[in-house]
Amino acid sequence: IKKIEIKRYINILKSGLYLLLADYSIILLFGIGRLFIEQSWGIEEFSKFSFSMSLVLLGVNFVNQIGLVLFPVLKKDYSSNFVNMYNKLNLNVNILLLLLPLGYFIIVWILSKWLPQYKISLFYLGILMPLAIFEAKMVLIINPFYKATRKERILLLINLTFCILRCISFFLLRIYSFNILYYLYDFLLLSFLKYILFF
């Protein structure tokens, strides 16, 4: 009995470790971009980009807290009503995310009055808005369902793969391009590919 209990605790610890690393790899995806931009363009351009990315991360982290609340509910009921719960949640989230562009225009209007010197940051924020939508769906729908179905290792593997791809793509961009917009488009492209892969 003790051996069985020890194995069970080890499996629980492994699952927790996979989830922890998967969550940190998401943060790393954003951190890699900040690091490369700071190294390539200096602190002034980095501050403009970082302001936009901080707003995106603020929204993603807020949505992530909602996903943490959803996980126990999904874990309890997924076996009996999994497909219906997924479809219903996906529909509701899609409706809510349609309001995100409206929120962007409100934020731009407020910040343009309050911080006019950060006008270029608001432009970057508009480019990164689809990234916020992709990541919000990831942390609100995909991550909780992968956790509920005990697919933490797949979640970690995909996140780490895209961390490596982002490092490679940013390294190539640093060599062959000095346009910061290409970095932003690279952010969007890889996030979109990850979103498609999970769905």
Region spans (language model):
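Membrane-interface helix-loop junctions in multi-pass transport and translocation proteins
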Residues: 1, 150-153, 161-197
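Interhelical loop/hinge segments that connect adjacent transmembrane helices in multipass membrane
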Residues: 1-28, 69, 73-83
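Membrane-water interface at loop-to-transmembrane-helix junctions
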Residues: 8-19, 81-98, 119-128, 146-158
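Membrane-interface junctions at transmembrane-helix termini in multi-pass inner-membrane proteins
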Residues: 130-161, 171, 199
